[in-house]
């Protein structure tokens, strides 16, 4: 068993049963290709999403260290911050969130609805900043201030994307491999690539469990040149933690994130509407809409390695639909 070292790491079980892996019949007919979807949008806390897999490991480490406060950072409409706040509430911990407004909007829905509304429901302490120019340093500075107030803080990086958090997506690769075994031979796997933890964790896990499947990250915030070192560095850090080798090529497509992170584009919004109308499944304008636009566009461009079945990793994010109204 190549991933046996996973069991060495403390983990809180928030998710329970595996999330569904489903065939999309109407969407497949529309695209002329077999499309499957991994439904991490329906993880069972705070309207779902992929970050809960990372938080199973990160929150366990926080409790091990005796923390009483979780500190993290992100944009106003961060799915990660929303799920971190929910985990803190469930565990009886304080949560402090350092937020930025990366698109400089004054739109009321973006500033108060969607994920931001949920942060208030989870009783999150909000600290605003002009920009997360050096989030690791900014989080450490915030942790120092919180500690001076008598709390015992545990810092969770942006997106939960360090080697420990990314183990959640090595675990996910195990789940995917078990669900596919004897049912479908997945040719390609598509995932949104942002803070890089989900992408890197899948890269390590799938290399050992489904080596014939190519993994493609569709960038949501950076060019290939900027994103590649982030994914590779995390891939190698995860492999080191698990005492494995990681030599799988990291494939990135950066044609679909313009005009920038957190700004919807036409292709992404069309993908959101298409999957909603054909399958009743909700994507979001920031991550999964753009990643699905990459899947759709690259079928017609024949950029996949062959014409076999494609698995789309649905990382969640639907609460942001309300924040981006009326653009949706």
UniProtKB/Swiss-Prot annotation:
Q: Does the keyword Iron apply?
A: no
Q: Which UniProt keywords apply?
A: Lyase, Pyridoxal phosphate
**Reaction(s) catalysed (UniProt annotation):** D-cysteine + H2O = hydrogen sulfide + pyruvate + NH4(+) + H(+)
Gene3D superfamilies named among the record's database cross-references: 3.40.50.1100
Its cofactor is: pyridoxal 5'-phosphate
State the top-level EC class: lyase
List GO BP terms, alphabetically.
Answer: D-amino acid metabolic process
Record-listed E.C. numbers: 4.4.1.15
Q: Where is the signal peptide?
A: none
| Residues annotated with N6-(pyridoxal phosphate)lysine modification | 51
Cite a single GO MF annotation: D-cysteine desulfhydrase activity
Its family remark reads: Belongs to the ACC deaminase/D-cysteine desulfhydrase family.
> What does this gene product do?
Catalyzes the alpha,beta-elimination reaction of D-cysteine and of several D-cysteine derivatives. It could be a defense mechanism against D-cysteine.
Subunit text: Homodimer.
- Indicate what this protein is called per its UniProt record: D-cysteine desulfhydrase
């Amino acid at each position: 068993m190549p991933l046996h070292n996973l069991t060495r790491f403390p983990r809180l079980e928030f998710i329970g049963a595996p999330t569904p892996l489903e065939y999309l019949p109407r969407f497949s007919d529309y695209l002329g290709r077999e499309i499957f979807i991994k439904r991490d949008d329906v993880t069972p806390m705070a309207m779902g999403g992929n970050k809960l897999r990372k938080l199973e490991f990160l929150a366990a480490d926080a409790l091990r260290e005796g923390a009483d406060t979780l500190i993290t950072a992100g944009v106003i409409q961060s799915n990660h911050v929303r799920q971190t706040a929910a985990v803190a509430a469930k565990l009886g911990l304080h949560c402090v969130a350092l937020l930025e407004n990366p698109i400089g909007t004054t739109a009321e829905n973006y500033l108060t609805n969607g994920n931001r509304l949920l942060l208030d429901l989870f009783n999150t302490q909000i600290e605003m900043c002009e920009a997360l120019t050096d989030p690791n340093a900014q989080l450490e500075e915030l942790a120092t201030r919180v500690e001076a107030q008598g709390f015992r803080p545990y810092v969770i990086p942006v997106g939960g994307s360090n080697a420990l958090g990314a183990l959640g997506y090595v675990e996910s690769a195990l789940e995917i491999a078990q669900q596919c075994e004897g049912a479908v031979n997945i040719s390609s796997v598509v995932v949104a690539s942002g803070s890089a933890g989900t992408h890197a964790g899948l890269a390590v896990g799938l290399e050992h469990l489904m080596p014939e499947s190519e993994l493609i990250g569709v960038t949501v915030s950076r060019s290939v040149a900027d994103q590649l070192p982030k994914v590779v560095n995390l891939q190698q850090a995860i492999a080191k933690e698990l005492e494995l080798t990681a030599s799988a090529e990291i494939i990135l497509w950066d044609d679909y994130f313009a005009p920038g992170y957190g700004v919807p584009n036409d292709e992404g919004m069309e993908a959101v509407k298409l999957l909603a109308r054909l399958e009743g499944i909700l994507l979001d304008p920031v991550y999964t809409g753009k990643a699905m636009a990459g899947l759709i566009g690259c079928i017609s461009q024949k950029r996949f390695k062959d014409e076999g079945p494609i698995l789309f990793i649905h990382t969640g994010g639907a609460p942001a639909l309300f924040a981006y109204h009326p653009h949706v």
